[in-house]
């Protein structure tokens, strides 16, 4: 199973519909400061059930909605869709692809969907239980974790990377 596509619409700095196509294996998001790298990771964690606005670097959950600029109006909603593929075995579903999405509106409404059908946070959490995928996951390396890893010794670093890449130590 792997995350095949991230579709972001109105989430933080992503006012326009943005689609990121991913390939199997390890993916790194790189770019200059302020280009939205952390917002991509925040979007993933948000769909997977992050409930703390502070963990998403905001004061309230409405802070994930694009707030506008001098030249663009604020948007009324934010939506992110994560599409996973090759997931029949890991998720125990009959589907090769599973799309999980979350939508929030300025009036406080928040909805989850699994394959476009209304779902609860509990359903999303249950879907990914025991897969290593979730709002808190070793699959994502957030700001600050790089420094933490670099301060470990070589053996500890190897273990960390093996865990993240699902490789077994020799």
Where do the protein language model's features map onto the residues?
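Gly/Lys-enriched N-terminal cap/neck module of very large, oligomeric protein machines
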Residues: 2-170
């Amino acid at each position: 199973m792997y995350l095949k596509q991230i579709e972001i619409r109105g989430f933080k700095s992503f006012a326009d519909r943005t689609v990121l196509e991913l390939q199997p294996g390890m993916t790194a998001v790189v770019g200059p400061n302020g280009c939205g790298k952390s917002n991509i990771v925040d979007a993933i964690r948000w769909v997977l059930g992050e409930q703390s606005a502070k963990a998403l670097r905001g004061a309230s959950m409405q802070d994930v909605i694009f707030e506008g600029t001098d030249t663009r109006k604020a948007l009324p909603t934010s939506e992110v869709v994560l599409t996973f593929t090759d997931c029949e075995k890991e998720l125990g579903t009959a589907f090769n692809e599973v799309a999980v999405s979350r939508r929030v509106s300025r009036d406080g409404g928040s909805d989850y969907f699994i394959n476009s059908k209304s779902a609860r946070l509990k359903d999303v959490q249950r879907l990914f239980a025991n897969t290593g995928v979730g709002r808190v996951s070793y699959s994502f390396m957030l700001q600050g974790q790089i420094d933490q890893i670099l301060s470990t010794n070589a053996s500890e670093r190897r273990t960390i990377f093996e865990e993240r890449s699902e490789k077994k130590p020799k």
